[in-house]
């Protein structure tokens, strides 16, 4: 019985519309940032290097290079802190987890674009 209640609550919280994306895609995540009494949106653009599909507990990791330093950020897919998610570019990769990109830099870290 409690299982049905939990499923119902999770279904309500997962009502947010999220575009389909996969590892290798370049995405722009608009994150709500609260500074003092005001709040604003902060864009985080990078390549999805990992995706974890677990219903309400789903998450994805985005990697970008900021002034020569690699920055990774893990987002909960259905978090209220995420305002919007947009896919800028589809990547053509063969692996589900792109952790090898951490060791690559410059042109070697590029990902081919999926043509379709």
From Swiss-Prot:
GO terms for molecular function: structural constituent of ribosome. SUPFAM superfamilies: Translation proteins SH3-like domain. GO terms for cellular component: cytosolic large ribosomal subunit. Pfam families: Ribosomal_L19. It comes from the Bacteria. One of its GO terms (biological process) is translation. Keywords: Ribonucleoprotein, Ribosomal protein. The keyword Nuclease does not apply. Belongs to the bacterial ribosomal protein bL19 family. PANTHER family: LARGE RIBOSOMAL SUBUNIT PROTEIN BL19M, RIBOSOMAL PROTEIN L19. This protein is located at the 30S-50S ribosomal subunit interface and may play a role in the structure and function of the aminoacyl-tRNA binding site. This is Large ribosomal subunit protein bL19. It comes from Pseudomonas entomophila (strain L48).
């Amino acid at each position: 019985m409690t299982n049905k209640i939990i499923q119902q609550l999770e279904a309500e919280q997962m009502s947010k519309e999220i575009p389909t994306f996969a590892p290798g895609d370049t995405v722009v995540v608009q994150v709500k940032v609260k500074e003092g009494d005001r709040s604003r949106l902060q864009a985080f653009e990078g390549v999805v290097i990992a995706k974890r599909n677990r219903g309400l507990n789903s998450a994805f990791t985005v990697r970008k290079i900021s002034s020569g330093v690699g920055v990774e950020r893990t987002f909960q897919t259905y978090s209220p802190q995420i305002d919007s998610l947009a896919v800028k570019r589809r990547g053509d990769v063969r692996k589900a987890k792109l952790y090898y990109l951490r060791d690559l830099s410059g042109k070697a870290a590029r990902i081919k674009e999926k043509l379709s």
